[in-house]
C-alpha cells in the first residue's frame, strides 16, 4: 500500500477496559503487519467529547469513524432479529453463548445488521451476563423488584422482561443512565459487574444481585464503504486481527468480572447470590417471553442458537 489508510477506532469507556484494550490489540496487529500502510488512531470514550454512547452508531455508519462497537440491543430498532438475543435466560453459560455467537446464530444476525446498516460486521465482543443493582433493598425474588424504576437498554424485549418481573423499566442511553443513577431518579440498573464498576454505579447502589438474566454481545462494526475500498491485504489483516482480539477480549472480561466483584465488595456493597429456587422463580416469571419468541422469531432462531 503506497499511501497510509486511516483507521479511526472508538468506544465509550476508559482506556483500561477490556474493550479499549482489544481495540488497541487490533490496531497493534495492523501496524505490525502493514507498517506505514495504515494510520491508526483511537478515541477510547466518545462520551468524553460530549457524545452519547449510542452516537457511535451513526459516527461509524457515516464514516466519521472507521470502526466501533455497541451492545446489540441498541440495534434492535432497525434489526429486530437482534431482539432474540435479548431474551432472558437464553444461554446457560459463556461456552454456550460463545458457540452460538461464533456460529450460525452470529452469522445470521450479522447478515441482518448488514442489510439495515452501512456496516460490515467483523465479529462479536462479549458484554456478558448481566446483573441487577439498586439503591433500595436486596433482591432475592421478583417480588423484591416491585415498583422499582430500572434502567434497561433500548430494547422492547428487555423492557418486557422487567415488566414481567414487576419492575418499572425505563429505556435509556448509557449517558442518561449514569446521570440518573447519580441523581437517584432511577432506583436500579442492570449490567455486567465490570460495567457497573467502570461507570461508578457501585458508589451509588448498595445492593447487587447476581441474576445472570441476559447475555449480551457487542458487534464490532466497520464503515462498509471504507472496508469495501480497502485492498485485500488490509481486509485480510483486519479479519485476522479481530478474530484474535475477540478471544483476547473474552479472556480479559473474565478477569474483569472477578476484579469488579472485589471492587463492589470493597465499596461495602451487599452481593446476593441467588439460590437455585430463587433463580427458578425469575425464570418462571419471564417464561411467557420464550413462548412468544417462538412465534415472533420462529423456531429456526432457536435452532441457529443450538437450543
Mark where each language-model region is.
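Hinge/lid segment of periplasmic solute-binding proteins
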Residues: 102-115
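N-terminal secretory/targeting leader peptides
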Residues: 1-95, 114-115, 119-307
